[in-house]
Amino acid sequence: MNLIFAKVLCLLAILVLMMLGSLIPVKISEADFDKSSRSRKILSLSNSFAGGVFLATCFNALLPAVREKFFDLLKIGNISTDYPLAETIMMVGFFLTVFVEQTVMTFRKEKPSFIDMETFNAGSDIGSDSEFESPFISANHGHNLYEGGHSHHSHSLNIKELSSSSPIRLFSLVFALSAHSVFEGLALGLQEDGNKLLSLFIGVVIHETLVAMALGVSMAKVNTHLKDAIKMAVLVSTMIPIGIVVGMAIQSAQNMASSIASALLQGIAGGTFIFVTFFEILVKELEEKNDRLLKVLFLVLGYTVLAVLVLFKW
């Protein structure tokens, strides 16, 4: 299959699945999401699987590709060094992602009643050891958090506040929340072989669809109007496609500057995958009391599936 065509298919699939994930809960808001323990268990295990996929994507696909790119670039420049450039760039990407998220939270002037940042993670909170509560279930065990009260979390955003914001403010807030998604898209758009593209796509589409579903549930909880829900869903869902398009444009240039940009951006994207895996998925899923070993099994399974897929050419 033509690689450009495959990337376009990835773009469309991610866009459609994230839009559906965001909007379906709004259309069926009468469903009792909080009591659906089976659904939450499935989401939680899927998220753990996605964590394993991201680990394999980062360390079995992206890291070797970035090493190879830097090796070729240094060879062209007749430069010899044993310094771990690929690993360093990945850590730059990791710290950059942490910095962007924490900067947004630091400069927020208020703590409006929920939406919690954890809403952008798709995990469950049943039996959590954490002092923080679920974005879906309040400390009073079942009262709607969106009816009032304040978050134990310092980073919280209000769905109604977001949906009624000016377009520029809405885009800036959602972009800040989804900044790492752009780098995930860049990683997809910059890929040069099919097997790595497939492994990246599987990890991204699983995790980001779950993220979109979590957002959709939160919008349903506060009875967000469909028009406002569509506005939110479109903004969140287009972050990865934007990254894919930019990555494809850079990769198609086929010159020295594009090669350097590709190596740097793929390394930064690798750091983003590390952030998503450890800060958004594992820290959330493995803190819970229920199904811990099962989640570890799905984590290992996700890693194994992608580690095997990387062996094959597609």
Curated annotation (Swiss-Prot):
Residues 25-41, 106-169, 218-229, 284-292 are cytoplasmic. The keyword Signal does not apply. It is found in: Cell membrane; Apical cell membrane. It catalyses: Zn(2+)(in) = Zn(2+)(out). It comes from the Eukaryota. The chain crosses the membrane at residues 4-24, 42-62, 85-105, 170-190, 197-217, 230-250, 263-283, 293-313. One of its GO terms (cellular component) is apical plasma membrane. It is a multi-pass membrane protein. One of its GO terms (molecular function) is zinc ion transmembrane transporter activity. Residues 1-3, 63-84, 191-196, 251-262, 314 are extracellular. GO terms for biological process: zinc ion transmembrane transport. InterPro entries: ZIP. Keywords: Cell membrane, Ion transport, Membrane, Transmembrane, Transmembrane helix, Transport, Zinc, Zinc transport. Transporter for the divalent cation Zn(2+). Mediates the influx of Zn(2+) into cells from extracellular space. Belongs to the ZIP transporter (TC 2.A.5) family. PANTHER family: ZINC TRANSPORTER ZIP3, ZINC/IRON TRANSPORTER. This is Zinc transporter ZIP3. It comes from Xenopus tropicalis. The gene is slc39a3.
